[in-house]
Amino acid sequence: LDGLREATAGANRITGQQKLEGKFDDVKLPYLGYADYQGGGVELKTKWDKGAGTDKPAASSLPKEIMWSHLTQIAGYWHMTDVWPTIVYANRLGYRVFKPTLEQLQAGVAAIREACMRRERLLAAASSPEELLRLCDPQWDHMYVWRDLPPAILEQAHKIWRS
């Protein structure tokens, strides 16, 4: 809570999650995001204990700078709202608050725009959902995307990508 208090200091009212929608130059489809607090002005990232289910849990470390995936997220919110974002990283021992630079935000917006344009090209190139999936890397080794899916879903995914 201390990190959120610091990030929202001076606010007369604190607002929770809000759906944001905007556009990027040369991108036809809308860009969507769900901001945590203050209409995109404050994003909270929690770092949970490692080994939480054991008798020796260890607090995950807090980053020393904004992580790239989180920077692109808040840069998208900034692009849509013109609200300068703050990001709070918190674990059970403490927190860190970061405000990105203009250069960081601009780099994040450029990366989002490029990714959106690439996705639109993939959508245009595919004639079916299955073909679209085959154009993408399934990332079978991703740490959580495929982890807890029912076997029937995994089997269907393997059929799509391996055909």
Spans of features found by a protein language model:
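Short, catalytically relevant binding-site loops at active-site mouths
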Residues: 22-23, 48-50, 93-94
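Metal-dependent nuclease catalytic regions and adjoining charged, substrate-binding loops involved
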Residues: 64-66, 76-163
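A short acidic, glycine-rich active-site loop
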Residues: 59-71
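Short, structured patches in soluble enzyme cores that scaffold and shape functional sites
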Residues: 18-20, 44-46, 89-91
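Short secondary-structure capping micro-motifs at structural edges
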Residues: 23-25, 73-76
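Extracellular structured ligand-interaction cores
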Residues: 32-34, 71, 82
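Conserved catalytic cores of phosphodiester-cleaving nucleases, focusing on short active-site segments
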Residues: 16, 33-61, 76-77
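Metal-dependent nuclease catalytic cores that hydrolyze phosphodiester bonds in DNA/RNA
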Residues: 1-40
